[in-house]
From Swiss-Prot:
Pfam families: ATP-synt_ab, ATP-synt_ab_N, ATP-synt_ab_Xtn, ATP-synt_VA_C. It comes from Clostridium novyi (strain NT). PANTHER family: H(+)-TRANSPORTING TWO-SECTOR ATPASE (PTHR43607:SF1), V-TYPE PROTON ATPASE CATALYTIC SUBUNIT A (PTHR43607). One of its GO terms (molecular function) is proton-transporting ATP synthase activity, rotational mechanism. This is V-type ATP synthase alpha chain. It is an enzyme of class 7 (translocase). Produces ATP from ADP in the presence of a proton gradient across the membrane. The V-type alpha chain is a catalytic subunit.
Length: 591
């Protein structure tokens, strides 16, 4: 192919001429150091290229060579437990080759070419196969059984397939198609900007159980759903994302650190290998893929890292796995779009963001979902996309937050005031919402308890009434309230502090199963039922609220381990006995 030459360099944007043979979104190599870039605009023979590496020292006249193929990722065994940069270069391999810093023009294969994987066939000679069918499996980690699928566009009859140890570039199967014999390797490539195909999309119904009480009870996200976590600085977005990555009951986690601090990725690398998955007992790292594109890495690669992450997630979804994708933060990605748009001299939209911000965000979130995968067995897979948004100054009316809210169905609004009061997770229960409540409510009623929806509705009503009553208290004081209204304030305080507050760094409180959440919520609300019974019998509210030891036990129920959940029921029994005793002693006197 003809080689072009650079005529202008503007930060990560390079303009080259003599590129008439290239196509938009082609991958190109720029300069003597062969920096990786991607064509984002074509005008005649001039191409605008966003370069994914530092362009310092690059000048006019430098050669530009097109590869003739789009930016693609390598998909195969070796993805799990790996850490990549925004364009899927393995950071560990780069560190061994070049030290602590990314060297310009360094070329490293995404997947290890030397490691051998044991391949076990699932089909045999002369079987008919088509795109998406599982040819065999590779046990990648103790948790993940990596399924090797027929690549898209191939259909025919298996000629050869053998069990054995192979590298990702070895041919494991030959398929006779109408276009000749096609060789299938353990690895396949896929362009990042193109969604992987599936048979049909399904309606998400089952919840992604996160172990975080405010999320699972009040604002659940379905497996295959999309959620946004907007919040100002210091409100706990990253900790919420880490908690979901640690405890969410997805089988695979893809964590994208997009333009955030390097320390946060270091935390993930240090914590995840030590943490045990409550379902498998194995390290959480054994089901995790990390994509680190920290704030000091080239801006253009931020734009690619979101697509790299979702393509890897789609690959595991196609195997029939439930995948959780965390993007922290989509605001940094939008800022990268804004910078490139400005350098391209495009007409700016709101706050300088490009006019196509909404459609780019939609392209990303719409690749989430629950689907029937390609292949004969009609297996189901799901991607749950959870994006953090960092609005400047916590202003939720800014363009990235508003564009995101138009697309996602779950909104967990983090509140700086709650964070300053040390209430974590700082999700504001009054302005957050989930549009999956009805379908997940039916699932909860069937699988956890028939009372689930009623208890949740009651608790939410109490919290909303508390907000109204606080307005009255501020105006005329608490003495103006009736005893039953003052009781509501006490119960609301108990819901907030004993149920919704959760310590991410406590061994027990960091994760609550659905059964434990149900028992805890029932216990908190049974305090209201029993207290109202006592009020009707003539007991003064002060007598009920002064049952300090019992209320302390209710507050400490969150620290009861999962295997000792029967103790929560015992506290409920004790509560009934104490109220009966109180009615016997006080009720008659005051009646």
């Amino acid at each position: 192919m003809k080689t072009g030459r650079v005529i202008k360099v503007s930060g990560p944007l390079v303009i080259a001429e003599g590129m008439e043979e290239a196509n938009i979104y082609d991958l190109v190599k720029v300069g003597e150091k062969r920096l990786i870039g991607e064509i984002i605009e074509m005008r005649g023979d001039k191409a605008s290229i966003q370069v994914y590496e530092e362009t310092t020292g690059l000048g006019p006249g430098a050669p530009v060579e097109t590869t003739g193929e789009p930016l693609s990722v390598e998909l195969g065994p070796g993805l799990i437990e790996s850490m990549f940069d925004g364009i899927q270069r393995p950071l560990e391999a780069i560190a061994k080759k070049a030290g602590s810093y990314l060297t310009k023009g360094i070329e490293v294969f995404s997947l290890n070419r030397d490691k051998k994987w044991h391949f076990v066939p699932k089909v045999k000679h002369s079987d008919k196969v088509k795109a998406g069918d599982i040819l065999g499996t590779v046990q990648e980690t103790e948790v993940v059984n990596h399924k090797i699928m027929v690549p898209y566009g191939i259909e025919g009859e298996v000629i050869t397939i053998f069990e054995g140890d192979y590298t990702v570039e070895d041919v494991v199967c030959e398929i006779d198609t109408k276009d000749g014999v096609k060789k299938v390797k353990l690895m396949q490539k896929w362009p990042v900007r193109k969604g992987r195909p599936y048979a049909k999309k399904l309606n998400p119904e089952a919840p992604l159980v996160t172990g975080q009480r405010i999320i699972d009870t009040f604002f659940p996200v379905a497996k295959g759903g999309a959620a946004a976590v907007p919040g100002p600085f210091g409100s706990g977005k990253t900790v919420v994302q880490h908690q979901l990555a640690k405890w969410g009951d997805a089988q695979i986690v893809v964590y994208i650190g997009c333009g955030e601090r390097g320390n946060e990725m270091t935390d993930v690398l240090n914590e995840f290998p030590e943490l045990k998955d409550p379902k498998t007992g194995k390290s959480i790292m054994e089901r995790t893929v990390l994509i680190a594109n920290t704030s000091n890495m080239p801006v253009a690669a931020r734009e690619a890292c979101i697509y790299t992450g979702i393509t890897i997630a789609e690959y595991f979804r196609d195997m029939g796995y439930s995948v959780a994708l965390m993007a922290d933060s989509t605001s940094r990605w939008a800022e990268a779009l804004r910078e490139m748009s400005g350098r391209l001299e495009e007409m700016p939209g709101d706050e300088g963001y490009p006019a196509y911000l909404g459609s780019r965000l939609a392209d990303f979130y719409e690749r989430a979902g629950k689907v029937v995968c390609l292949g004969d067995d009609e297996r189901e897979g799901a991607i749950t996309a959870i994006g953090a948004v960092s609005p400047p100054g916590g202003d939720l009316s800014e363009p990235v937050t508003q564009a995101t809210l138009r697309i996602v169905k779950v909104f967990w609004g983090l509140d700086a005031q709650l964070a300053y009061r040390r209430h974590f997770p700082a999700i504001n229960w009054l302005n957050s919402y989930s549009l999956y409540l009805d379908s997940i409510g039916r699932w909860m009623d069937r699988n956890v308890s028939e009372e689930w929806v009623d208890l949740r509705t009651r608790a939410m009503t109490i919290l909303q009434e508390e907000a109204n009553l606080e307005e009255i208290v501020r105006l005329v004081g608490i003495d103006a309230l009736s005893e039953s209204d003052r009781l509501k304030l006490e119960v609301a305080k108990s819901i907030r502090e004993d149920y919704l507050m959760q310590n991410a760094f406590h061994d027990v409180d960091t994760y609550s199963s659905l059964e434990k959440q149900y028992k805890m919520l029932k216990l908190v609300l049974s305090f209201q039922d029993e207290a109202e019974r006592a009020l009707k019998a003539g007991v003064y509210l002060e007598k009920i609220t002064s049952m300090v030891e019992l209320r302390d036990k209710i507050a400490r129920a969150k620290f009861i381990p999962e295997e000792e959940m029967g103790r929560i029921d015992e506290i409920g029994e004790e509560l009934r006995r104490e109220i009966d005793k109180l009615i016997a002693e006080e009720g008659v006197i005051n009646a």
